[in-house]
UniProtKB/Swiss-Prot annotation:
It comes from the Eukaryota. This is Nucleoporin SEH1. WD repeats lie at residues 7-46, 53-94, 106-147, 153-192, 210-253, 302-341. GO terms for cellular component: nuclear envelope; nuclear membrane; nuclear pore; nuclear pore outer ring; Seh1-associated complex; vacuolar membrane. Its main location: nucleus. InterPro entries: Sec13/Seh1_fam, WD40/YVTN_repeat-like_dom_sf, WD40_repeat_dom_sf, WD40_rpt. It holds the Pfam family WD40. One of its GO terms (biological process) is mRNA transport. Keywords: Membrane, mRNA transport, Nuclear pore complex, Nucleus, Phosphoprotein, Protein transport, Repeat, Translocation, Transport, Vacuole, WD repeat.
């Protein structure tokens, strides 16, 4: 393990690798985004560019899939999501290497999370913030990355939290291309799975129970070689929870559901009425007819304090968690399908 100095002047909120693991983007309360590249000869991380991106703390960033170019999305407490594209013709460390494509400013509250969808769903992203509304945007014309369309809105919280209260919101897309479009969303103490139905709209498919305090992080595991899905959460109560998600579908039904989901990938649906209320009857009906079964596989409190981040490896076999104890723990399933801590990493290693 080799640490590097980010050079930020304030708290670093997010650190994200690109698809190939050769670049790292960081964001901070100093309102700057920094991009580092890996030097193959020295294995050191070198600054590629740094720029002031928002008017308030930047709390989340994400890389788009590489087939759409080198694009970064950033979310901030200034209530905006901004998209950035690299210009390789500009000199490194000039502050001009990343150009702003557009600003998405539909949110009425501070934003906490932004994530690009898996590549097979097209160029789209989701964001979630303090107004309690999940928003999905599509680049309907990939040749024009400056034009993004708001295609879905879902009211995750009936009443948004007061500004003076501590809150947190996270989201994670289902990476499986063999499953209908789904994403897991955490808002305060609740975690919900949304799925796009045959009507082209997002509906509540399942809820992840048992959380008794703020959920700080949620991560949907890749399901390579596995017939079920895994979702992990990290919470303020110091616990890591790993859930098993089973889809009750026959192969024929799965194929039909996937086909119907793909038909509506680019549909412009808004799931709230003119007064901003979600169709609760439709959601309840969809939840009752949900094909998802949720089971709590493991629950651990090894960090002895708040858990701030959970993340899966590329194969979905190892989970990493980071907490207030200043340690990163790696978790792996045993033959009995129970997750055990296999390694503990500290900053001194």
């Amino acid at each position: 393990m080799q640490p590097f100095d980010s050079g930020h002047d304030d708290l670093v909120h997010d650190v994200v690798y690109d698809f190939y693991g050769r670049h790292v983007a960081t964001c901070s309360s100093d309102q700057h985004i920094k991009v580092f590249k890996l030097d193959k000869d020295t294995s050191n991380w070198e600054l590629s560019d740094s720029w002031r991106a928002h008017d308030s703390s930047i709390v989340a960033i994400d890389w788009a899939s590489p087939e759409y170019g080198r694009i970064i999305a950033s979310a901030s407490y200034d209530k905006t999501v901004k998209l950035w594209e690299e210009d390789p013709d500009q000199e490194e460390c000039s502050g001009r290497r990343w150009n702003k494509l557009c600003t998405l400013n539909d949110s009425k509250g501070s934003l906490y999370s932004v994530k690009f969808a898996p590549a097979h769903l097209g160029l789209k992203l989701a964001c979630l913030g303090n107004d309690g509304i999940l928003r999905l945007y599509d680049a309907l014309e990939p040749s024009d990355l400056r034009s993004w369309t708001l295609t879905s809105e879902m009211k995750v919280l009936s009443i948004p939290p007061a500004n003076h209260l501590q809150s947190d919101f996270c989201l994670s897309w289902c990476p499986s291309r063999f499953s209908p479009e789904k994403l897991a969303v955490s808002a305060l103490e609740q975690a919900i799975i949304y799925q796009r139905g045959k009507d082209g709209k997002l509906h509540v498919a399942a809820k992840l129970p048992g959380h008794k305090s703020l959920i700080r992080s949620i991560s949907w595991a890749p399901s390579i070689g596995r017939w079920y899905q895994l979702i992990a959460t990290g919470c303020k109560d110091g616990r890591i929870r790993i859930f098993k998600i089973t889809e009750k579908l026959s192969p024929l039904a799965s194929e039909e559901s996937l086909t119907n989901s793909n038909m509506f990938d680019n549909s412009a649906d808004v799931d709230m009425d003119a007064q901003g209320r979600s169709d609760s009857n439709t959601e309840e009906k969809a939840e009752l007819q949900s094909n998802l079964q949720v089971e709590l596989l493991s629950e651990h409190d090894d960090h002895n304090g708040e858990v701030w981040s959970v993340s899966w490896n590329l194969t979905g076999t190892i989970l990493s968690s980071a907490g207030d104890d200043g340690k990163v723990r790696l978790w792996k399933a045993t033959y009995s399908n129970e997750f055990k801590c296999m390694s503990v990493i500290t900053a001194q290693q």
